[in-house]
Amino acid sequence: MEVLRRSVSWHIRNAAVAMAIFILITIDVLHSGPLTEIDANIALWNRPELPDWADWIIYNLDHLGLRGLTALCLLTLAIYLGRRFKTWRPFNLSLLSLLALNLVVGLAKLEFGRTKPKLQIDLLDAGGMSYPSGHASNAILTWGLFAYLAVKYSAPSKFRTNLAIWSVSVVSILVVLISLFRNTHWLSDLVGGVSIGAALFFLIVAIDRVISSSRTINTPQVHSV
């Protein structure tokens, strides 16, 4: 019971830290702070021309942050785990994460209306959908929950847990770097997306820890995915 309490507390603290980072980035964006200057400099980089095959790879790797793909993968795993262990828990958590992501990130995009860097002008309330990045928030929340469920409903394995953590980290970083290379998002969009996605992930895991379930084989340790 004490381990569970510490786990919930740890996830809530991390959610608060991630949300604080998102708020700070948002303030910077709203007031054209130092981060927006970095945004402008990165947007002006000369991107190299890639051969068709390399451009195809980059384009498709960017889909790792696509809402439809990530949702399909997560729900497929959730349904499989639900049928195997006769529980609605994976599906309910997945549905909660997708609803939270679309509600929070979607409303934020509409509220800020930030233009994309490809327009070569950074404007708010201009009908844009750039901030925060849906690709970045999708990557860390949806793939994070995918990894969490895969580890939770499997036999205890430190290797599997570490592999899940590193996999989600690599995918999230890859999505950020590809977005910067393709100039589809400002850096602050991406950092904001990662932070709000992480905050939602930690909150959902905390909810899962608070509401007990008898169908779980393995609950990852406090500092797991």
Where in the sequence are the language-model features?
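Alpha-helical transmembrane segments of multi-pass membrane proteins, especially transporters
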Residues: 44, 93-98, 190-194
